[in-house]
Regions:
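Conserved, structured C-terminal
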Residues: 2-38, 42-53, 126-302
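Acidic active-site catalytic centers that drive phospho-/nucleotidyl reactions
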Residues: 73, 122, 217
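Short amphipathic beta-strand starts and helix->beta connectors
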Residues: 60-67, 112-122, 149-152, 197-205
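Acidic, proline/glycine-enriched N-terminal capping motif
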Residues: 2-113, 118, 247
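Generic hydrophobic, aliphatic-rich segments that mediate packing or membrane embedding
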Residues: 61, 76, 86-91, 108, ...
Length: 302
């Protein structure tokens, strides 16, 4: 597959590099990641082609996470914008965390369950404004959210392709971002986010990640993706910034005790036998289940 013209023609728009027969999509960063990927090892992630390693082995990328700064393309995450007067109530009915106490600019990690209290998926909820949120997830949830939202005063937009995302993880990540951000990140708390700009380009930054180390996730308009990638690599050179693939990320998230759908658990939507389904308590996520909040899907079973 990698001898295909889609990898040879670097001038093609990332939207057009696959035909209807290829089944895979390309990230807004692919024009950069494909040239940097010495190993040409790739994985499928939510229908996208994602780098496994950039170098022939993962060691340097792993140690960049732990000792320097690692730059990861996380654009394949599913991203949905929920906006409107009933947005808080909708999300509160979907997830196990108490969304009513989520502050503007705060991010909450949460699972969500089926009626039997078995986990469908997990992800984050970002409160962008009074009545506007972004929810991220590993697999598609748009139809399910739309179904639950029936009759509510909300709009739901699939933001997965229009918003690109990068993770900058590691002990040097804050210094790199402070060197280009219009707003200092020194006071940004864990699981909070801010809007800022990099040399005039608008971005949002959340102090979140999947490594257990100091790190941030950067949310970018798709059309600005390459500008931001180039800027980060340029400003991060002296800090040891390293493009990093999913292999090193896997090791880091295991060390941090963070779970992954289809590896550590099976979505209750897809489990063929009942014993493959898991409750949040069985996954070590009991801390994220708030039984004293308003009713939510699966609460009675839990």
């Amino acid at each position: 597959m990698f001898n295909s013209p889609i990898f040879e023609n670097k001038s093609m728009s990332f939207k057009n590099k696959f035909t209807a027969n290829t089944q895979l999509k390309l990230s807004p960063f692919f024009e950069r990641t494909s040239k940097l990927n010495e190993s040409q090892e790739w994985r499928r992630w939510s229908g996208y082609l994602s780098a496994t390693n950039y170098e022939l082995t993962h060691e340097n990328e792993y140690f960049a996470i732990r000792t320097k700064a690692a730059l990861l393309d996380i654009s394949p995450l599913k991203k949905y914008l929920i906006d409107g007067p009933d947005a808080s109530n909708l999300l509160d009915s979907l997830v196990t965390r108490n969304i009513q106490i989520c502050k503007i600019g705060q991010v909450m990690y949460t699972p969500w369950c089926d009626e039997n209290g078995k986990v469908i998926d997990d992800g984050t909820v970002q409160r962008l404004s009074e009545n506007k949120y972004r929810i991220t997830s590993a697999e598609p949830n748009l139809d399910w959210i739309n179904h639950i939202a029936t009759g509510m005063n909300v709009s739901i937009l699939d933001d997965s392709e229009t918003t690109a995302a990068l993770a900058l993880q590691g002990p040097n990540s804050r210094e790199i971002l402070n060197s280009i951000s219009g707003t200092s990140l020194n006071d940004l708390k864990f699981f909070y986010m801010i809007d800022t700009n990099f040399n005039g380009t608008q971005v949002s930054i959340s102090r979140t990640g999947y490594t257990g180390d100091l790190g941030y996730e950067i949310w970018i308009n798709q059309e600005d993706a390459l500008v931001i990638w180039d800027l980060l690599l340029d400003k991060g050179k002296s800090y040891g910034i390293t493009p990093t693939g999913l292999h090193a990320l896997d090791i880091s998230r295991i060390e941090a005790g963070l779970i992954l759908l289809d590896v550590d658990y099976v979505s209750s939507r897809h489990a063929i036998i009942e014993s493959r389904k898991s409750s949040p308590f069985e996954l070590g996520l009991g801390w994220a289940v708030k039984m004293n909040k308003n009713d939510f899907i699966g609460k009675n079973a839990l």
